[in-house]
């Protein structure tokens, strides 16, 4: 375990609430808290047992005045989150008492923790690996039950075990190659080369299984970025309101009412989906509306999915065709809206035939008709079959990239062996593949990148 100074931070959101928790970790944490704690009947923390709590007060050292009534819990390292001696002070959930207690801890010898420093210490002290540490922030940011369960599995080390299993197999192959080079025999090298190719193909298959679910995993982690587009007044804002079941966007008969981008998250069978309502795309001389149209186009570029809305009560025009041309390279669903007006758009229309989407849905957003079909289409576009929370899913783009690079190195090793080049050259590619997988767990990752990952965490975590 590494040696560090003692750090402190507020672990709960700032503001009014039932309680606030101030976390302190390091070898001097018990001494520091003891110096400002006064228990009932002048009891101290000298005899506090690990994994227990003690009632008392935090006292300002200089004035000897009481700051707040508290409960102090003590977790002795290495059996704590950071693998260090850790204390948590539970005080009343107000801004003033929380700040005053933290200030007193700093005055008594603790240092204000950096964002993510508690989790970083858990990683550096060997209690968790980097993929497990990243899962902590995924749990905090999860937007659906399914995304939380996926993050919890990663936090438990499910991904780490699979990665370590593959890396151990790679090390055995490298050792086999080195033994062959050290004790060369004409027929031994050929046999070893053939065996290594078989092993590498099995490893690639395992990596492929992880990569295949990574796009779905990325959506579970980051959400499905879904943008609603169409001309003004086709029902985009009404669709947003219907999907989130709230009157978030202003709906009027006046075209061009929505001039800015409105974003909300919804849960579609466990899939966190960000719904983005955009300004209607059309030619306009209105300066503000024109800015809104440009923002709409930017959001389309960023989208995972586009919902293209057409008005069943009106004929297709040049503006519809221009929008279609703009989204043709995206995944999209077409909504033929305003079915309730009974003015059915001619589905034999050449434009409708040209729509490159198997998902064309007639809807009446006003009457909530077709919304369930829309949600089912969204799920089917990105997920094959039922999404199961017990399956191992790669959710992090960094992990996906490392897997892809590792796979490429394995393929390069097979090509080297196939070209009958000296077998020890293949070990270079296999070692690179091993290194790339180690970036997922943090075993072979540059310290600056590790620092950047933890800097994205919140204070107190």
Curated annotation (Swiss-Prot):
Query: What's the name of the protein?
Result: tRNA modification GTPase MnmE
Entry GO MF terms: GTP binding; GTPase activity; metal ion binding
* EC id: 3.6.-.-
Record-listed Mg(2+) binding positions: 237, 258
Please describe what this protein does: Exhibits a very high intrinsic GTPase hydrolysis rate. Involved in the addition of a carboxymethylaminomethyl (cmnm) group at the wobble position (U34) of certain tRNAs, forming tRNA-cmnm(5)s(2)U34.
Family (UniProt):
Belongs to the TRAFAC class TrmE-Era-EngA-EngB-Septin-like GTPase superfamily. TrmE GTPase family.
Query: Per its UniProt record, what PROSITE patterns does this chain match?
Result: G_TRME (PS51709)
């Amino acid at each position: 375990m590494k040696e560090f100074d003692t750090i402190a931070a507020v672990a709960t959101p700032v503001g009014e609430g039932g309680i606030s928790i101030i976390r302190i970790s390091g070898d001097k944490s018990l001494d520091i808290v003891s110096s400002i704690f006064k228990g009932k009947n002048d009891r101290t923390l000298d005899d506090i047992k690990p994994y227990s709590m003690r009632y008392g007060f935090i006292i300002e050292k200089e004035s000897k005045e009481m700051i707040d009534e508290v409960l102090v819990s003590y977790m002795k390292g290495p059996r704590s989150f950071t693998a260090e001696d850790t204390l948590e002070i539970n005080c009343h959930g107000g801004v003033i008492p929380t700040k005053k207690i933290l200030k007193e801890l700093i005055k008594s010898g603790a240092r204000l923790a950096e964002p993510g420093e508690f989790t970083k210490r858990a990683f550096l002290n060997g209690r968790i690996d980097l993929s497990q540490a990243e899962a902590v922030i995924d749990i905090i940011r999860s937007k659906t039950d399914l995304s939380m369960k996926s993050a919890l599995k990663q936090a438990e080390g499910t991904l780490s075990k699979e990665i370590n299993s593959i890396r151990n197999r790679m090390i055995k192959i490298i050792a086999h190659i080195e033994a062959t080079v050290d004790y060369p025999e004409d027929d031994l090298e050929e046999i070893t080369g053939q065996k290594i190719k078989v092993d590498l193909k099995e490893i690639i298959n395992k990596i492929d299984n992880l990569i295949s679910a990574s796009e779905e995993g990325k959506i579970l982690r980051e959400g499905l970025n879904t943008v609603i587009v169409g001309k003004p007044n086709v029902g985009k804002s009404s669709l947003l309101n219907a999907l989130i079941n709230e009157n978030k966007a202003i709906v009027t008969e006046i075209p061009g009412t929505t001039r800015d981008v409105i974003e909300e998250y919804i849960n579609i069978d466990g899939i966190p989906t960000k719904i983005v309502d955009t300004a209607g795309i059309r030619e306009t001389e209105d300066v503000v509306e024109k800015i809104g149209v440009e923002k709409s186009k930017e959001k389309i570029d960023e989208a995972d999915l586009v919902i293209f809305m057409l008005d069943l009560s009106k004929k297709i025009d040049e503006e519809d065709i221009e929008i279609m041309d703009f989204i043709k390279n995206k995944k999209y669903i077409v909504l033929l809206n305003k079915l309730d007006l009974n003015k059915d758009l001619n589905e034999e229309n050449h434009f409708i035939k040209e729509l490159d989407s198997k998902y064309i849905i007639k809807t009446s957003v006003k009457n909530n008709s077709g919304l369930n079909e829309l949600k089912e289409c969204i799920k089917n576009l990105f997920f094959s079959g039922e999404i199961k929370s017990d399956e191992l899913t790669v959710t992090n783009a960094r992990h996906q990239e490392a897997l892809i690079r590792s796979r490429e190195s394995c393929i390069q090793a097979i090509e080297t062996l196939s070209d009958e080049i000296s077998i020890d050259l293949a070990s270079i590619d296999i070692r690179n593949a091993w290194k790339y997988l180690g970036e997922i767990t943090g075993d072979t990752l540059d310290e600056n990148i590790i620092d950047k990952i933890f800097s994205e965490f919140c204070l107190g975590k």
